[in-house]
A protein has these predicted regions:
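A structural signal for small-residue-enriched, beta-sheet-centric alpha/beta enzyme cores
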Residues: 84, 176, 191, 196-203, ...
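Conserved hydrophobic residue
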Residues: 31, 36, 238-239, 357
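Glycine-rich cofactor/substrate-binding loops
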Residues: 1-13, 17, 37, 41, ...
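Short amphipathic alpha-helical segments with heptad-repeat character
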Residues: 97-108, 115, 145-148, 152, ...
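Acidic, glycine-rich loop-and-beta core segments that form the ion-binding/anion-interacting portion
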Residues: 185-278
Length: 421
């Protein structure tokens, strides 16, 4: 990913756009055809470009000055009718399209690892949590199936963002093609694999760029959510999973026992930066009239950084999921913690099915559950003592309501929906 945004790679893109524009003009008879091979001998010298920029204070003019020096009279065929943003915005579109391709490969790799782990953990029972509290049983595989579904949407989201940003422009100072034949624009964009912006000003409208970084921020948010779950699962009181931890890795300078979920914490922290970069792109939409330059300084930071950070996050999350250690015994113990209160809804529904008013049934089950929690008793034993329950449910019927596997009876449908069956 970093290679896409290296200064030399950027300058090479600028040069290719300038050369293609000259070729386009040559096809129209406006530039001598025999000049094109000579122009193609142009090279980029980042050090020379930097030196010139320090003098002229304009990166594109410094670039043109540097590449023109060995070209002699042929240099006049470069930048014909163009404005700086014709080159800069079109090059940025190529860079972001390539960056999206890297991110899509990353997403495909993470998707495959999550798919494999979801398949393996389909029947691994654990407790589901809402508001941070025990709710009802589910399986780790079911949770991972949700991640898989979300990653599918992430891939589609990046694909849409890629398509929207895959747009170039060579339309001149305010976008009217007064100095650039539209056929030159079409030729250059086609050779670069870009669509032509239907309408542009001096720049490509920044709603496209805002949407691109917003898409990256949403993907980062998904990884943030996954990593947050892992962090809680690894907490000492829960201890259901563990991140990969190297043989020589250390968790604390003071406490040798520490095995912290630092990889997941890192992902959560980096997600905040990507969200911040997206906000910058949203702020950059409101340029003055046909263009000002307030967006430029910010974009030079946020686009390379956001792409590289998300690339790293995706590869790191792939490493975490692939190497995640699952403690199934601890999951089972946690599931039964609280004396079986996670089965309260099944008792409620059974009482209603046997003729009890729903609100009455709710209150009976609620009192029994809270008593079990407060007194450290087994919910199953407390609810069995309630006279209203004994009147309607036999001990055998009540016993069947405390089977964790019951909650997985329709997981197959979910797996089929996400393509796991």
């Amino acid at each position: 990913m970093s290679a896409i945004f290296e200064p030399e790679a950027k300058f090479l893109l600028w040069l290719e756009i300038e050369l293609l524009a000259a070729e386009g003009w040559a096809q129209l008879g406006e530039v001598p055809s025999d000049a094109i091979p000579r122009l193609r001998r142009a090279k980029v010298d980042p050090a020379r470009i930097d030196a010139l920029e320090a003098r002229v204070g304009h990166d594109l003019l410094a670039f043109l000055g540097a590449v023109s020096e060995p070209l002699g009279d042929d240099a006049r065929y470069l930048h014909r009718g163009l404005t700086s943003s014709d080159v800069l915005d079109t090059a940025l579109a190529v860079q972001l399209t390539r960056a999206a391709d890297v991110l899509l490969r990353d997403l495909a790799g993470l998707h495959e690892v999550v798919r494999r782990r979801a398949t393996a953990e389909r029947d691994t029972l654990m407790v589901g949590r809402t508001h941070g509290m025990h709710a009802e049983p589910l399986s780790l595989g079911f949770v991972l199936a949700g991640w898989l579904d979300e990653l599918g949407r992430a891939r589609a989201r990046v694909e849409r963002a890629r398509e929207e940003i895959r747009v170039g422009k060579l339309s001149g100072a305010v976008g009217t093609h007064a100095t650039v034949d539209p056929r030159v624009e079409e030729f250059v964009c086609a050779r670069l694999g870009l669509q032509v912006a239907p309408v542009s000003t001096q720049v490509i409208a920044r709603d496209r760029h805002a949407a691109f970084l917003a898409a990256l921020a949403v993907v980062a948010g998904s990884l943030d959510k996954f990593a947050t779950d892992i962090r809680h699962w690894q907490s000492s009181e829960v201890a259901e999973v563990r991140e990969p931890f190297g043989d020589e890795q250390k968790g604390s300078s003071a406490m040798p026992h520490k095995r912290n979920p630092v990889l997941s914490e890192r992902i959560c922290g980096l997600a905040r930066t990507v969200r911040g970069y997206a906000l910058v792109a949203l702020e950059d939409q409101a340029l003055w009239h046909e263009r000002d330059i307030s967006h430029s300084s910010a974009e030079r930071i946020v686009f390379p950084d956001a792409c590289m950070v998300l690339d790293y996050m995706l590869r790191l999350m792939t490493q975490v999921v692939d190497g995640l250690t699952v403690d199934r015994q601890r999951m089972h113990r946690n599931l039964l913690q609280g004396g079986g209160i996670v089965f309260s809804q099944r008792v409620l529904l059974a009482l209603v099915e046997h003729g009890m008013d729903r609100d009455q049934a709710y209150r009976i089950v609620q009192r029994a559950a809270h008593r079990a929690l407060d007194d450290g008793q087994q919910f199953r034993e407390v609810i069995a003592q309630a006279p209203e329950v004994r009147e309607r449910l036999t001990p055998e019927e009540l016993s069947t309501l405390f089977d964790p596997a019951y909650y997985l009876r329709n997981v197959r449908v979910t797996y089929e929906r996400v393509g796991l069956a």
